Amino acid sequence: MEEYKVTLDGPAPWGFRLQGGKDFNMPLSISRLTPGGKSELAGVNVGDWLLQIEGDSTASMTHIEAQNKIRASSNKLGLVLSRFAVGANHPKGVHTPESQGRKYNFAPSTALNKIARPFGSGTPPPDNSRPVQVTKPVAYNPPPTSYPSSQMPQGQLQNGQKSRTVSNVSGKDTTDHPIPPAPSTGPAVRPPWTTDPTFADRYAPDKTTTVMTKHTQPATPTPAQSRNSILQAAQVPSSGDKTPVCSQCNKIIRGRFLLALGRYYHPEEFTCSQCHKVLEEGGFFEEKGSIFCPCCYDARFAPNCAKCKKKITGEIMHALKMTWHVPCFTCAYCKTPIRNRAFYMEDGKPYCEKDYEQMFGTKCRGCDFKIDAGDRFLEALGFSWHDTCFVCAICQINLEGKTFYSKKDKPLCKTHAFSNV
């Protein structure tokens, strides 16, 4: 991280919007810059973390406390920010414009959802949602024909199935030695604002967002994959290999056997821990050392939908600290599934951005732009105004807190009270 200090000359506006805070469980950062504003000219970028305001650390500040600290500065505003020193795709001073601004929400904001956790893993991944890994066991039948030691084939090709999991499951001869599975490596984690151009807009403090994950079912491999998995497993054993012992009954295995999760099984004893169905041909899930068939795993561990109360076995919607079917979490007005887009809460009901803007949005009478959450505004002449937009229609002097006159719904100062508009 590269830290830098910025001093902005007053008065307000300072030309930036904040997001995050202690109450949102995320650090304070810059979510939006006014084109040509003081912050943009000073080299501040969208996504930069705000470390200090006027020498005070922001680590323990809520969003409102940070706003009040900034408002208290009148002549100068000193900030300490940080940004990633590498990976910047835009030159200094050039910023990608945002497609849409934030909405003004008159109801208390809902805290952002935390990162989704996939269902079906013994230890949930720390920072991303990954599909449940499913393993398919395969069985190997020894050939009925016996060969002399000099003519023993180097590999027997039999029917089987390969799984899409880190755990290698294969069938072997009784004297074969298992090949340890190779560890898998995941992609390097990058900050969300470097990979998602809409991160700042979707995670504005007044918005509520959703996260979707996938509850994956076992996949059926192709015949080519099956042949490859058996070919790698069925190698001629050395004379020093030991006879496998079943992990279920602790007896020596004679003939066919299964190898799953690093243990040997008789095919008929590799069963679901709940319904005791033989899992030789189907996929299975491993949870806390127990083995389950897909049906029992869904019934026992799959989450319930907050609306219909049924089990969720496909896409999972995470919103409002609950889980939903995607078709069950919809806009209260247009009934369209919100999916992974931002939404707004009004009277306890979710609304998509389009409908919320039409039904509850507020615009400034002076500039015709939306009044964002955290903006200072006032009510006058039956309209809402930004505090910097309520000016005399002729001389543009600010009229906040001053006596004014109106003509044709336009404010006028004392000097131009009787002028033509």
Swiss-Prot record:
Q: Main localisation, per the record?
A: cytoplasm
Q: What InterPro entries does the database record attribute to this sequence?
A: PDZ, PDZ-LIM_domain, PDZ_sf, Znf_LIM
The keyword Amino-acid biosynthesis is annotated on this UniProt entry: no
Write down the Pfam families for this protein, in alphabetical order. Answer: LIM (PF00412), PDZ (PF00595)
GO cellular component terms given for this protein? adherens junction; filamentous actin; stress fiber; Z disc
Domain named LIM zinc-binding is located at 244-302, 303-362, 363-421
Which top-rank group of organisms is this from? Answer: Eukaryota
GO MF annotations, alphabetized:
actin binding; metal ion binding; muscle alpha-actinin binding
Instruction: Give the keywords, sorted.
Output: Cytoplasm, Cytoskeleton, LIM domain, Metal-binding, Repeat, Zinc
Which BP terms from GO are recorded? actin cytoskeleton organization; heart development; muscle structure development
* Residue ranges of the region described as Disordered: 115-193
Every copy of the PDZ domain together lies at 1-85
Q: Does the keyword Cytoplasm apply?
A: yes
Cell compartment(s), UniProt: Cytoplasm, Cytoskeleton
Q: What is this protein called?
A: PDZ and LIM domain protein 7
Species in which this protein is naturally found: Xenopus laevis (African clawed frog)
